Every structure is written in C-alpha cells, then in structure tokens.
A protein has these predicted regions:
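Active-site acidic/histidine proton-transfer and metal-coordination neighborhood
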Residues: 1-58
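Generic structural signal for well-ordered alpha-helices
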Residues: 10-17, 41-48, 79-86, 126-130, ...
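Short helix-capping segments at alpha-helix termini
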Residues: 18-24, 49-53, 89-93, 135-137, ...
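Conserved, mostly hydrophobic/aromatic
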Residues: 27, 59-60, 99, 142
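Active-site-proximal loop/turn and secondary-structure-junction residues that shape catalytic pockets
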Residues: 31-35, 60-64, 103-105, 148-150
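Gly/Pro-rich active-site loop or hairpin
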Residues: 38-41, 64-139
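A short, acidic, flexible beta-alpha connecting loop/helix-capping segment that sits on the rim
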Residues: 142-152
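C-terminal helical cap(s) of enzyme catalytic domains, especially alpha/beta-barrels
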Residues: 151-167
C-alpha cells in the first residue's frame, strides 16, 4: 500500500542519516510527476520531517502533471505550496526552497515528458510563480528543466521576474 511505502521510505531515510551522521550537506527529496510513485507535496514534507538534513525539492511541473493539469492557475496556487512548506517545516525551508520548473506533458497516470515554454497545451505557466515569489519576498533556487530550451526558458523567467520587480531586464 501507499502507507506501507511511506513507512518504508521514512525508515530508510532515518537509517541513511544514522549511517551518514551529522553533515553540512542538505539532501533534497523531490516531488514526483507520476501518480503511482511516492512524491506528493504532503509525502515529501513527511519524509523531510525524518531529519533536518532533508529538504523538499518542489518540481511544479511534476505537481501539475500528477494532478492532470490545472494545479497552478494563479499566483495564490503557487503561494499555497510555499505557505504549506513554511507551516509544516519552517519559514527558512520555504524562503530558500530548491525548485524545478518546466511545462510537462501528462496522461491520466501523470508525467509523460518535459516540454518547452512554447508549448500552448501543457502547463503550468511560470508567470504566476514569479509573482508569488515577489509578493512573498522569497529567494528560491529554480532549475529550469525545459526540453532542449533550458537556458532560453530560464532567461525568460529571469527577465519576467526582474521586470516585475522594476529592474532592468538584462
């Protein structure tokens, strides 16, 4: 069952940290895009509670694909993710969240493949994410995972963010 898989994963993570001991290294646990895998936001948060060295890695495209689209229609839908993490793990986890972002094609089972920002069929859109980051004064690390256009799409995000903040869009 899913509950048994969660118990086993948390036990494994605890044993890992017993073996590793105290370390300055943070270990990321990522949200997943396929519905039959562990990796909902709630599951990742529970896994991160095993040890303070574990930090959530939120892939917004994965969460959108898991929910078969439409998960992030506006700024507030992104803000809820950051607020949930802050409430359950602490503000520092949310403020400096490590994120992945791309649009993702999906089926009823979840993630199928990463696509580019040019894709008009699949989401999510990045603009509301940038607005959420600005309004809540967050400082996340965002890795763009677009298929074949990572640099171009990452630059589009950066430009949008800077323009919204009133900075030069270099």
């Amino acid at each position: 069952t899913r509950e048994e898989a969660m118990r086993l994963s948390c036990d494994t993570l605890a044993r890992l940290m017993e073996t590793v001991g105290d370390t300055p290294i943070r270990l990321g646990i990522e949200t997943m895009g396929k519905r039959n895998q562990l990796g909902t936001l709630e599951e990742v948060i529970e896994q991160c509670k095993v040890d303070p060295h574990f930090h959530p890695v939120v892939d917004f495209g994965h969460l959108n694909a898991r929910g078969v689209g439409g998960q992030f229609p506006d700024r507030d839908s992104y803000r809820r993710v950051f607020h949930t993490i802050a409430d359950k793990l602490g503000a520092e986890y949310a403020t400096h969240l490590h994120c992945h972002f791309s649009k993702i094609e999906f089926t009823d089972a979840g993630e199928k493949r990463h696509v580019t920002f040019e894709d008009a069929v699949y989401g999510p859109e990045f603009e509301p994410l940038m607005e959420a980051i600005i309004v809540d004064n967050l400082c996340p690390r965002i890795i763009c995972e677009s298929d074949g256009t990572m640099a171009e799409d990452a630059l589009a995000m950066k430009r949008y963010w800077r323009e919204r903040r009133g900075e030069s869009a270099k």
